[in-house]
A protein has these predicted regions:
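Disordered, acidic Ser/Thr/Pro-rich linker "stalks" and the adjacent N-terminal cap
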Residues: 1-70, 74, 166-235, 251-253, ...
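Intrinsic, low-complexity N-terminal interaction/targeting segments
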Residues: 50-54, 110-137, 203-222, 269-288
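Beta-sandwich interaction modules
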Residues: 78, 120-157, 227, 238, ...
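A short beta-strand element within beta-rich, extracytoplasmic domains
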Residues: 79-90, 150, 239-249, 299
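Predominantly extracellular/luminal cell-surface or secreted proteins
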Residues: 87, 102-106, 164, 246, ...
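Short, surface-exposed beta-strand/strand-loop-strand elements in extracellular ectodomains
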Residues: 94-107, 253-265
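C-terminal functional regions that serve as terminal interaction/effector modules
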Residues: 152, 220, 249-252, 258-334
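Short, structured interface segments
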Residues: 158-169, 312
Length: 334
């Protein structure tokens, strides 16, 4: 299927970035935690447990009275939601005919009971679903959200719930003088890449370590004289002091070399790290001897291959701090 452009935005709810399904009113047939698993749903015919066919998703019992079923997800990356996907893969005679999505923004770590008592904002009104399908719904909201609530009408099964968007970090929870300028969770974003054949370049700047090769960025094998690259708009204008290029899990397919370039406008580039030899399955750390202000970063790998993570440690400039803080404030009132 042709996927909407906004599905290229990271999944703010994914377990891989720290999301959690904190509550569901019912999960008799299949556990709520399946909703945010990062991998694609699977189906194994004739795999029955003591409650029936085992599904890789969230499935509630058949309702015999009016009502709806709900699940609340705490976003691993609070941010502006651009769209959601309600994936009913492999649910055919037992998918919900309708779904709706709401959101709320709250500080701290409220309990499910406290969350349920809040006033929620509708992101997706009650909308029809198709069975065994990805059901995408674009969202028009400029606010920063911390939790979303999926309602299914009246009951049934959903394989995955994807909440795509742009992370917006809370400056009150960060040391803006020393943090990862290229981190997705801090608001950095991929603006371009030469190739994403095996996996998304968003993985490069995702939280935590990659646990397997598939959690990094890997390109197809090149058969020409070129090289692959990724460009990133940083969390804000800053001065980097240390770069980390991590090839963990990439053994026979790590790049041979890499370089870093910086820019203040995304068009005019200067050298940050010269072309440097890399080793397979290794976290490389490079102090930057002549740090300069930059707002964009370009990673070039030679000629192709896979990288697990890219980190760029440093501090925001005065202008970077101002823009970083204003982005958060604007999304709070959006």
């Amino acid at each position: 299927m042709d996927r909407p452009e906004w599905t290229a935005d990271p999944d703010l709810a994914s377990r891989r970035v720290g999301g959690s399904v904190v509550w569901a009113n019912d999960e008799l047939f299949a556990e709520r935690e399946n909703l945010i698993k990062p991998e694609q749903p699977e189906f194994r015919p004739w795999s029955f447990g003591h409650k029936g066919q085992i599904y890789d998703g969230w499935e509630t019992r058949r309702r015999r009275e009016p009502g709806i079923d709900q699940a609340i997800v705490r976003l691993g990356l609070p941010g502006v939601v651009t769209g959601v996907v309600v994936d009913t893969a492999f649910f055919t005679g037992n998918y919900p005919p309708f779904a709706s999505v709401e959101a709320v923004a709250v500080d701290g770590y409220p309990s499910p009971g406290e969350l349920s008592a809040l006033d929620w904002t509708t992101l997706v009104p009650k909308s029809a679903l198709k069975g065994d399908s990805e059901n995408p719904f674009q969202v028009s909201s400029s606010r920063r959200w911390t939790h979303v609530r999926l309602s299914i009408h009246p009951d049934g099964g959903v394989a995955r719930f994807r909440v795509h968007g742009r992370p917006v970090a809370d400056p009150r929870l960060l040391d803006l003088g020393s943090f990862d300028l290229a981190a997705l969770e801090h608001g950095a974003r991929v603006t371009g890449a030469s190739n994403m054949f095996y996996s998304s370049p968003n993985n490069l700047i995702s939280p935590g370590f990659a646990s397997v090769m598939g959690e990094g960025w890997e390109t197809a094998r090149r058969r020409d004289d070129g090289n692959d690259w990724v460009e990133i708009a940083l969390a804000g204008e800053g001065v980097p002091r240390l770069a980390e290029l991590d090839t963990s899990h990439f053994k026979g397919n790590a790049p041979g070399w890499a370089s870093l370039s910086g820019s203040l406008d995304g068009e005019t580039w200067f050298e940050v790290l010269p072309r440097t030899r890399l080793q397979p399955d290794t976290r490389h750390r490079f102090p930057l001897e002549q740090p300069r202000e930059l707002s964009h970063l370009r990673l070039d790998i030679y000629p192709d291959g896979g990288m697990a993570r890219l980190r760029l440690y440093g501090g925001l400039t005065e202008r970077g701090r101002s823009e970083f803080t204003e982005r958060f404030r604007a999304a709070q009132s959006g």
